[in-house]
């Protein structure tokens, strides 16, 4: 009996060559619409789908393959006489191979000018139905959704006359992943269209971006996936200009770095980061000077760190960065001279180019945190804060210079692991105390880092001070300006201690925990 293949593809790459090889092997080919036209034009004889169904394609192509003569030919079990008898009695011929890929829904909704009606018209119905029918009956039917599998299928058909069960099962698994992701994307689009923020079912679809050597540690397997609808301002979308492949830890650190610099848009700024914590942030009138400040902030911790700059890297800045061992540099652009300097004898230095225009859109994405047996979903910690809404709770008002330092420190503290303390002046961080289990320990670490540079400095705390002992430590170091959320039942004790030492203290009313 002659084997039959049904081919209906939107992505026609390689399909003519594939069909020609099938014909050489003696297969009949059933086809539809544009695919049939392409194959006929190439001189490949095909059978029209309506010759199988007895019905013409109708309703602008919405109805063409949803017919028992198609799905019966796909779903009939070859090992059951009752199925084969039913097919014979109803004039249904068996279909042994299905090659289908789907309407380009993703590509359609990514177009900036797409209309709702256009999106709806690009939801494939018949394609997924054929794929699922064939995949369900993979014991007998080969199903191909990815052109990269053409070669594998042809090789087996040529060598042994059929595909192996292992191949059919693997291809069926790929189909079910593909149709699930396709439907998830449609669900995501419709959920956004109706403004639903707490769907009872959460379906996310991601594409494999990079197979990784290992995860956070060598004993952990890992891979990197990118959202099916890519975010422009993201590490997954960055263009790598130089260096080794990004590691798991590189990606996490780089993501943290580009989040931080989103909050420093107005002036040239450089952020240095290590293990998800900023170790130096500098801002100035030029990117070169901002680098100077970021490096000066902590010239020890920056070794082996990640640096992100929010302006083009110029020659002068590159010359200063080149001698320092860095894992990654990220910037919106690089001058030709700067790139030549940075790559000279630095083949392993990872240099990424990232378009900063997409920052605002990246801020509205939800954050997903995996826990054993579940997942937490929250908005990013992005909130517009205005200094004139803050409250000075002490007798002494901060000076103008202190106000600038307090505002700078408050922007930066948001990205320090809790319990987090950060000391800064108006243009650079001076000391960072991250991730301690009690706040006074974080205060001591930050002060120790900044101890020789505390003149005119301000201190920020990501959450309230639970006891006045923190204020006593800060006062003993000579710091005269503090910014914190407030909200402790013992706030008055902290205020009294600040007043006793002549410290100006601001309550923002906004907490910035970071776990």
From Swiss-Prot:
Pfam families recorded: AICARFT_IMPCHas (PF01808), MGS (PF02142)
Keywords from the UniProt entry: Hydrolase, Multifunctional enzyme, Purine biosynthesis, Transferase
Segments forming domain MGS-like: 1-145
GO term, biological process aspect, one: 'de novo' IMP biosynthetic process
Organism taxonomic ancestry: Bacteria, Bacillati, Bacillota, Bacilli, Lactobacillales
Highest taxon in the source lineage: Bacteria
NCBIfam families in alphabetical order: PRK00881.1, purH
Any GO molecular function: IMP cyclohydrolase activity
Record's protein name: Bifunctional purine biosynthesis protein PurH
CDD domains for the chain: IMPCH (cd01421)
Enzyme Commission number: 2.1.2.3, 3.5.4.10
